[in-house]
Amino acid sequence: VNVDDLLRDTLREQAAEQPPAGPGFADWVLAVRRRRRTRQLVAAVVATVAVVAVAVGVPQLYSGRSDVRPSGVVDRGNTSAHPGQSPPRELIAAGRTALAAYYIPTKVTVSARESVSERTYWLFDRKTGTYVKAPKWSVVTVAPGMKTAAVLERTLPASRIGLLDLATGEVKRWIQVSHKVGGLSFSDDGRKLVATTYTHNPDAEFHPADPNVGEPDVPSSRTGFYVLDVASGKGSWAGVTIGGQRADGLTTLVNYRQDFALTRDGRYIWAGLPSDEVDKLFYDFTGAEVPAPEDGSKYLVWFVDAGLSPDGEHVAGDFAGQTWTTSSYVIDSATGEKSEVRGQQLLAWADDRSLIAWDIGKGDSGAGKSEFHARLVLVTIGSDKEVPLSGFLGGSTDVSAGRWQPVFATR
């Protein structure tokens, strides 16, 4: 595939994209950060993206026509981009990382005082090379290698965890739990699974009887976490308090959904906090608080999904917007020194120096522009180039038609 072909394919696909969404992005970001500072937030303003960047800075970029793989194979290292597809129909991948699944959120009214953001997932099917709807599951996380996923059934919190064979679409084993689960996360090696426990649906939103008084102050129902061995299904549960005044005088808050995850080395558990004084805490497997590991974990930003780079030398940071209109910080894990990389929200590392990110299209900044008009791109430390990987999102809120959220895994 030569540059002319790539450019022609990209222009053709982009011509079929959805029209820009309406304004209101800045207000939405402020509201989301104030309410829950969720991982789905899409940060501020514009990306200057040249179409010719499609052919720059990646090992090999496939057009939609040539991205067909044999059954059971997901090539490591190759870049698979579909700039005209949103949501994607065919595999999106770069370097070590692939879009293993995505979900579309829908707001469902439970009562006059409560609504729930429900997810409908599409999982990558190796046999067809496409994403296939999987309506049974309310939560899906995919293990490294993209052969197994951990799933929860529709009603949250759930009393059992399924281990789904992604080749067959069948659950290989159910893990029964006595504390109901609302969130799941694999360790980096795929051998452990952290399950966050809740007493109420963590995706619920509560509304005041009087809309003029603001949102009611409803505490999180999070109770703790399981650390489970994936091979045996065995593990232990630890209770963790949900926040408030600490013995050291600092105050912590917990979002209604605030899931736990394992640290890079798999020795500890951590979770973020939407607090100015304490933004994350680390625990041993008994739930006792411990210091941050000496691997750069102290620089982790809990709502930035990319985390530590594969070689451990960098940590993906929050929105920057200094060198470019839309950019994010990358932090040296040894020194804490910050530099910038293109992209408004860093989602996953493709290799030691490249990341998959959300970023806005060219011309989408300024008054009256559509700051929600974001797509997946590949960015690289030290480069001002971006490679479009997906088409643009539609809609103007996190539950609008045309919005979808990615689920990445190491392939």
Model-found features: residue ranges?
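Blade-terminus and WD-like Trp-Asp/Gly-His loop motifs, strongest in beta-propeller folds
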Residues: R89-R96, V139-A149, L184-L193, D259-Y268, ...
